[in-house]
Amino acid sequence: MAAVFLVTLYEYSPLFYIAVVFTCFIVTTGLVLGWFGWDVPVILRNSEETQFSTRAFKKQMRQVKNPFGLEITNSSAASLATGMALRTDCLEDSRLTCYWGCSVQKLYEALQKHAYCFRISTPQALEEALYSDYLHREQYFIKKHSKEEIYCQLPSDTEIEDFGPVPRSRYPLVALLTLADEDDREIYDIISMVSVIHIPDKTYKLPCRILYQYLILAQGQFYDLKQLFMSANNSPPPSNDESPEDRSVEQSLLEKVGLAGNDGDPVEESSRDCVVCQNGGVNWVLLPCRHACLCDSCVRYFKQCPMCRQFVQESFALCGQKEPDKDLLETS
């Protein structure tokens, strides 16, 4: 019996040693990958580890004041045949110029010209860059802080029923907001705003909405204005201890980054609660998913967005007063 056992052990010992070596190799590889920031199974991670070794880059941001605001007030009823209603909210006297059937190619060529050739600070400058490649033009004078509705509609004599199948060579409507007073252009970094608007027609019935918004800077840059996403859970209304000045500053900041509601009402306190601890106020935006969902304390613990699980490449703070330790934002 002993001889049979020894023979069996001798036959299977190489397989046993191979299995042990292979297991050690897998565990060592997992630990090394985890040390250098690669995502590894939870079972291979240190149970006492409280923070990830890889930190998202902190994106350097510069605060600028956007003097322009534009929204669609009748998106459900708007169409190419009946027109649409726009509401502006500008900090200074401005001009709203609407270009119907603007060439897609010419528009982006015009934006590139702003960066390399000349500045798009007036409607005339944009029209020269477009080579007047649009079907109809309307212009309105906007008084500062006026929220009057402006109704835009193609004239009936144009006899345009649609802009063709997708992909299209023309945008239904391009709205340009510019500062009316030349002196105001020296005050603001943002000198104009281009909004590309889709309007449903007989061929393409997607609901009316703003497709893109580009902020045109005096220095020659232009940026695509993106919306941020926040949680909308129900919670008690905001406390009355907050001063009106603090509320106005907070609301102004949210409007600049696109978080304010379309109706201009203050954002509820629920939308400012951290989705993890439900305690601190939301102050960090994660990129590229654009979820604003973490407070100053919780941002250091995540390399994946807690809302959509997408890996975080960069992040930035909405307010600069409170920041985590610098070493927590460094990438190994």
Curated annotation (Swiss-Prot):
Any one Gene Ontology molecular-function term assigned to this protein's record: zinc ion binding
Keywords: Cell cycle, Endoplasmic reticulum, Growth arrest, Metal-binding, Nucleus, Zinc, Zinc-finger
Pfam family, one: zf-C3HC4_3
Zinc finger motifs (RING-type), residue ranges: 274-309
Superkingdom of source: Eukaryota
Record's keyword annotation contains Nucleotidyltransferase: no
SUPFAM superfamilies: RING/U-box
Physiological role: Able to inhibit growth in several cell lines.
Protein name: Cell growth regulator with RING finger domain protein 1
Top-level taxonomy: Eukaryota, Metazoa, Chordata, Craniata, Vertebrata
